Amino acid sequence: MKRYSDSKPISSIIRREEKTDPKPEYQRGPVWSKKQKQLLIDTILRDLDIPKFYLRAVNNGNYEWEVVDGQQRLRAIWEFRRSEYKTSKDAESVGETEIANLAYSDLPEDLKDKFDSYALNLVILENATLDEVEEMFVRLQNGSTLKAAERRNALPGK
């Protein structure tokens, strides 16, 4: 397995949504609350740091990437970009700009640009076997709230 770091703006990740598998077999489904999604978007709009995303490079005809770690964050970004939910009703201004209770489509152009150009830190895994990816997934999730059954399902051969 080869691992390398990369950085891509959100706009690039948005364009690759159809080529990205957010839920390979070892992943759990979407579980983030609206409040968690809103906090992530607020963090991005304030240009604060978020954890890196781990993606497995695949070439299976359907997808180019599988999400190893960061699925919940990636889904939240995609959904906000499609204006499927709004920022928090009590979100504080970003600079002089009010952002409370706004969908992406309602943001002023400068904040749309800021959101779209926000750099996501990626770790790309190339030539990784399913066993290697599942092992990495378990290790990355070790400190999170994965349930015992989810952890068992992620183990190779389960």
Predicted regions located by residue number:
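Basic- and aromatic-enriched surface patches that contact anionic nucleotides/nucleic acids
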Residues: 1-7, 11, 24-158
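A short, charged helix-loop
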Residues: 18-19, 158
